[in-house]
Design a protein with these regions (language model features):
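Helicase P-loop NTPase motor core
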Residues: 191-193, 200-296
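Short metal-binding segments enriched for Cys and/or His
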Residues: 434-451
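Conserved RecA-like helicase ATPase core segment
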Residues: 143-237
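A basic/glycine-biased coupling hinge at the interface between accessory DNA-binding modules
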Residues: 1-107
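Conserved helicase NTPase motor core
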Residues: 80-181, 199, 309
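Short cysteine-rich clusters marking metal-coordination/redox-active sites
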Residues: 409-412, 430
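Short linker/helix segments within small regulatory modules
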Residues: 420-428
Length: 451
C-alpha cells in the first residue's frame, strides 16, 4: 500500500518520522541513506549551480557579518521554514570548515580583509591618519564596506566622509549592495550636507527627461532635476515593435544601415551599443555586422549590468518584453538568498527599473527599445504619456517608418492601445488581447489617414 505524505509534514519537519512510523507499521525496514551514500549521490549529480549558490551565500553572509543564530532567526520567519533551516544545517558546517581551512593556510578572502580591517580599526590595532575618506559609486556600497567606513569615522572625530553616488543607478543588490545605505545616508553617518550634480554631459535633454520621469515614479528614489548640455528632445527614444522573433535581425540591420549612412555623412565612426537584459540576447550575426559596418560603426554587445558607466552615440535595448526572460525580469530569486541580502524594496520592480534607467541613459543621441507585439513589456506604457509625445516615438513594423498612434491601456495598465484592423475597419485595441478586450475608435487625425 502507498504511504500518504503531505507538504505540511515537510514544512513542519515531521515527514521522516512519519515515514519511519508508517514503514514500521507495515513491517518494512526504515533504512535512511548514510552520509557517505548521500555524498556519493551528490557527487554523481555534479551540480555547479548548487556549489555556486553556497559560495555566494557564504560571501554575502560574511559581508553582512551574520552569525548562525541570526540566520536561524531569519529562517524561522521564512514561508518554507523547514527548507530554510535544512539549508542552514548544510551551509553552516561548510562555512565553518571553510574558515578553518583559511586559518590553517594562514589566508584570508576578500570579505575577511574587510571584516578584519574593520575589527582592527574598532579595537585601535590600527590608528588611521586620514582626514578625508573619499568613496565613489557609493550607491553600490555593501554593509561590510559601510561598516569599515563608519569605524574609521568613529575612531577619528575630525575625519570627514566625501561620498559620490547616484541612487538611480543602484543595480547590484544580488551582490550585497544596499540602496538604503545611500538613501538614508544621514541615518547611517550623521549630519550630512548634500550637493546635487544637476548637469549631464552624456544624454540629451529628451533622453534625460524620459529616464528621470520613469525612475522617479518610485517615490523612494531621491528627487532630482537634471539638465542636459545637449537640449535635443525630438524622437530621442524610439520604440521599435516587431511581430516575430525572427524579425529582430532584419529590423536591427535596417536601423544599422541608416546609422551607417549618417556616419558616412558625418565622416566619423559612430559607437553603437546593443544591450540585453540577458546575454542570450546577443545577435548571432553580430560578427558579420561588425565586419560589414567596420568603417562606419563601432558595434558592441553588452549586458545591461556591464554597460553601467559606459556611453555610446546610439543604444539598442533588446528584448524589452513580458513573459519568460523578460524585462523587467520575472525570474524569482530563491528565497534562501534573502537570508543574507538587504531587505527587499516595497516598490514593484525597483531594481529592474534602475537597470532600465541605466540602459536608457547610455546613449548620447538616441535610445531604441525593441519590443515584441505580443509580449510588450510593462515598462513601455509608462513611456507613452502625453507630455512625452514627440520625444518618445512608437514605430510598428507594420506601419513602416511612420509613428504609430499608441497610448497606455486605461483598463489593464500594462498593455498599450494601438491601431488594429478588424473586419469592420481599423480601431484601437489593447496589446494584451485576449486577456484585455479594451477597444475604442481611432482618434480623428488617425482615422483621416486610413485609406
Amino acid at each position: 500500500a502507498l504511504i500518504e505524505t503531505t507538504s505540511a509534514m515537510y514544512r513542519s519537519g515531521t515527514l521522516f518520522s512519519h515515514l519511519e512510523h508508517e514503514l514500521n507499521a507495515r513491517q518494512q525496514a526504515f533504512r535512511p541513506r548514510s552520509p557517505e551514500e548521500i555524498l556519493a549521490r551528490l557527487a554523481e549529480q555534479k551540480s555547479p549551480s548548487s556549489t555556486g549558490f553556497i559560495r555566494t551565500f557564504i560571501t554575502l553572509c560574511k559581508s553582512r557579518n551574520q552569525t548562525p543564530d541570526q540566520l536561524r532567526d531569519k529562517a524561522d520567519q521564512q514561508r518554507d521554514r523547514f527548507r530554510a533551516l535544512a539549508f542552514l544545517d548544510v551551509v553552516v558546517p561548510v562555512f565553518q570548515k571553510y574558515q578553518e581551512k583559511l586559518a590553517a593556510l594562514r589566508c584570508v578572502d576578500f570579505e575577511d580583509m574587510i571584516r578584519t580591517a574593520t575589527r582592527y580599526v574598532r579595537e585601535k590595532k590600527f590608528v588611521h591618519p586620514y582626514r578625508i575618506i573619499l568613496v565613489d559609486e557609493f550607491q553600490d556600497i555593501a554593509h561590510g564596506r559601510a561598516a569599515l567606513v563608519l569605524a574609521m569615522l568613529e575612531q577619528n572625530p575630525d575625519c570627514r566622509l566625501f561620498a559620490v553616488g547616484d541612487d538611480w543607478q543602484s543595480i547590484y543588490r544580488f551582490a550585497g549592495s544596499d540602496i538604503a545605505i545611500m538613501s538614508r545616508f544621514p541615518h547611517h553617518f550623521g549630519v550630512t550636507a548634500t550637493n546635487y550634480l544637476t548637469r549631464t554631459f552624456r544624454s540629451n535633454q529628451g533622453i534625460t527627461n524620459v529616464a528621470a520621469g520613469f525612475i522617479q515614479a518610485n517615490p523612494a528614489q531621491l528627487t532630482k532635476t537634471v539638465h542636459a548640455v545637449d537640449s535635443t528632445q525630438e524622437a530621442t527614444i524610439q520604440i521599435l515593435e516587431y511581430g516575430k522573433d525572427e524579425d529582430v535581425e532584419s529590423l536591427l540591420e535596417s536601423e544599422l544601415v541608416t546609422l551607417a549612412e549618417s556616419a558616412r555623412s558625418e565622416k566619423r565612426i559612430l559607437r553603437i551599443f546593443l544591450l540585453g537584459r540577458y546575454n542570450h540576447h546577443r545577435p548571432a550575426v553580430l560578427a558579420k555586422w561588425k565586419k560589414r559596418f567596420e568603417r562606419e560603426l563601432h558595434l558592441e554587445f553588452l549586458s545591461l549590468h556591464r554597460s553601467k558607466g559606459l556611453e555610446a552615440d546610439y543604444v539598442f535595448i533588446l528584448g524589452v518584453n513580458s513573459g519568460s526572460y523578460s524585462f523587467p525580469s520575472e525570474i524569482i530569486d530563491d528565497p534562501l538568498i534573502d537570508l543574507v541580502l538587504p531587505i527587499p524594496e516595497d516598490f514593484e520592480n525597483a531594481e529592474e527599473r534602475r537597470l532600465f534607467y541605466v540602459g536608457l541613459t547610455r546613449a548620447k543621441r538616441r535610445t531604441y527599445l525593441l519590443t515584441k507585439k505580443s509580449r510588450i513589456s510593462k515598462f513601455i506604457p509608462e513611456l507613452l504619456k502625453p507630455r512625452l509625445q514627440g520625444t518618445v516615438v512608437y514605430r510598428s513594423s507594420k506601419q513602416g517608418e511612420h509613428s504609430a498612434h499608441v497610448e497606455p491601456c486605461p483598463s489593464c495598465g500594462t498593455g498599450i492601445l494601438r491601431v488594429v484592423t478588424g473586419p469592420y475597419g481599423p480601431f484601437m485595441g489593447c496589446s494584451n488581447y485576449p486577456n484585455c478586450t479594451t477597444k475604442r475608435k481611432l482618434p480623428p487625425q488617425d482615422n483621416a489617414r486610413q485609406p
